[in-house]
């Protein structure tokens, strides 16, 4: 039954469009009624954050619904989104918030997606990725994004977010759905110190994201 419903949604462009519009206006209302609190590491501030160019930002998959709040004001931003059903909805949704899309994944040897990422970074665009997506496990980095950052000498910055008012979906990542009139907390970490060791870079990104996630509770 669940598979049949997913197949129906995937093939129903009209229904997907309606869902996207409803989600967009709901999130707009949430962001309008919520207070935002940014915390910056590494001597950064909001102005520097908004003016970053050619940077990769990484955050956990369950924070996707908070990502428009994270990147409001950024220009020339591309989100790496999977071709799955939830990706199709996100594809349309992020576009309404001014973010462009690269369809694919860095853990599936998607040559087209990798070329697009590298090309956009070289043009000064910023890329946002969820390194534990698209299917988990939650809070476990399974993406090759650290290899791209090291090879092309690009900054890789971890970023996390939470909200004081939310509910969670019964998905693999317990997706956070913000509720109006809360406080959205966003922590922008320091760029990772990347080395020639792929495994160390991979584990370092995971460690930093987990550490920042714990900091959200303080």
Swiss-Prot record:
InterPro entries: DUF374. It comes from the Bacteria. The chain crosses the membrane at residues 14-34, 175-195. GO terms for cellular component: plasma membrane. Its main location: membrane. It is a multi-pass membrane protein. It is found in: Cell membrane. Keywords: Cell membrane, Membrane, Transmembrane, Transmembrane helix. The keyword Acetylation does not apply. To H.pylori HP0270. This is Uncharacterized protein RP090.
């Amino acid at each position: 039954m669940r598979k049949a419903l997913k197949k129906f949604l995937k093939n129903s462009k009209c229904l997907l469009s309606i869902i996207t519009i409803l989600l967009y206006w709901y999130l707009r209302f949430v962001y309008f009624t919520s207070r935002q609190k940014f915390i910056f590491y590494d001597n950064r501030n909001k102005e520097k954050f908004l003016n970053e160019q050619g940077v990769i930002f990484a955050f956990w998959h369950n924070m996707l619904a908070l990502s428009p709040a994270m990147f409001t004001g950024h220009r020339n931003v591309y989100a790496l989104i999977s071709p799955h059903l939830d990706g199709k909805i996100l594809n349309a949704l992020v576009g309404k918030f001014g973010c462009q899309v690269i369809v694919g994944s860095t853990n599936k040897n998607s040559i087209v997606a990798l070329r697009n990422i590298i090309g956009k970074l070289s043009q000064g665009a910023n890329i946002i990725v969820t390194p534990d997506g698209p299917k988990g496990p939650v809070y476990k980095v399974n993406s090759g994004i650290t290899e791209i950052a090291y090879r092309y000498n690009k900054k890789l910055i971890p970023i996390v977010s939470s909200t004081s008012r939310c509910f969670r979906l019964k998905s693999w990542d317990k997706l956070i759905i913000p509720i109006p009139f809360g406080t959205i907390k966003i922590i922008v970490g320091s760029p990772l110190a990347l080395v020639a060791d792929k495994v160390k870079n991979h584990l370092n990104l995971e460690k930093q994201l987990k550490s920042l996630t714990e900091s959200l509770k303080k």
